[in-house]
Amino acid sequence: SASESASASASERASERAPTSGPGGDRGARTTAGPTTHRLRNIVLMGMGEPLHNYDAVMHAIDILRDDAGLSIAAERITLSTVGVVPGILRLAQEMRPLHLAVSLHAATQAERAALVPAAKKWPLDELMAACRTYSETTGRRIFYEWTLIEGKNDSADHARAVGQLLQGLPAQVNLIPLNPTSGYDGTPTRSEAAKNFQ
């Protein structure tokens, strides 16, 4: 199975993004809906197009979210998710942006990843992992690696061992995600027993 250091539940990941102390850690936006005031704790930039394809606008939006005149969200509460846009990851490292980075990994070999993630054909796995290593070494931050479990595609014990080896030595956590079936993809969600064995 994947190494313990490279696995985390969604709740653990959320906890990692939401420190209760430290610089800015007690800040959080508040939104009002009717008579109830809600504290906005975390923001994840995901599912709205590839954030790193629109780097400058996304960073400007993050700056507004963080500003006291905006939503006053601490940077440690913001996660940016990418399919693996290598130039953007390297730019994040260069600019030392204090946010959390999540990478859609889903496979530990180039052939398997290219079959699941079209962007892997432009930015191969070895280039992606080199960029991730640079990011972690430069910023000192761990990366969250997203792994959507798909029956028969990436959910075997061999796949678990492969991702453990791929991430060995990196400050990493793997977030296992159940596949959400859609009409545009014929993959099947991993069965619960296989998911437990993968962990």
Provide a role label for each language-model segment.
Residues 2-37:
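Intrinsically disordered, low-complexity terminal tails and inter-domain linkers enriched
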Residues 35-198:
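Conserved AdoMet/S-adenosylmethionine-binding subsite of the radical SAM
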